[in-house]
Amino acid sequence: MSTVIGFDFGTKSIGVAVGQTITATASPLAAITAKEGIPDWQLIEKLFAEWQPEQLVVGLPLNMDGTEQPLTQKAKKFGNRLHGRFGLPVAFQDERLTSTSARESLFAEGGFRKLKKGAVDSQAALIIVEDFMNGYLPKSDNSL
């Protein structure tokens, strides 16, 4: 696996980020507008044509105690639709506190003007991709 595309699912905006497992780095991409959780599938198709992902990861919104919430099932449905449409493997990644971390990171970069909705969603997607890669990739042993 080398290219991973991650999604921070929302009913109005879906954050997107791309990660490279070879370098263990990720970058935010433009968020995709959604209508009641349904994205413009042609935009996602173009995104996949450009980046050629081998793995998809969808953030799984959970309550702080780990239980599911109403948005959890919608995110799972979105992931299942991605798999059905494009035939790519889809993993689900716990996304608790990713939006909070994304806001903190963006605010540190440029204050309130950086806190646009799409930017926060894609920064959250970046965190989802990084968390996925950190859990998936083998850890290196730097000891001698």
Curated annotation (Swiss-Prot):
PANTHER family: POLYNUCLEOTIDYL TRANSFERASE, RIBONUCLEASE H-LIKE SUPERFAMILY PROTEIN. The keyword Zinc does not apply. It comes from Idiomarina loihiensis (strain ATCC BAA-735 / DSM 15497 / L2-TR). SUPFAM superfamilies: Ribonuclease H-like. Transmembrane segments: none annotated. This is Putative pre-16S rRNA nuclease. Keywords: Cytoplasm, Hydrolase, Nuclease, Ribosome biogenesis. One of its GO terms (molecular function) is nuclease activity. It is an enzyme of class 3 (hydrolase). One of its GO terms (biological process) is rRNA 5'-end processing. It comes from the Bacteria. Could be a nuclease involved in processing of the 5'-end of pre-16S rRNA. Its main location: cytoplasm. It is found in: Cytoplasm. Belongs to the YqgF nuclease family. InterPro entries: RNaseH-like_sf, YqgF, YqgF/RNaseH-like_dom, YqgF/RNaseH-like_dom_sf. GO terms for cellular component: cytosol. The keyword Nuclease applies.
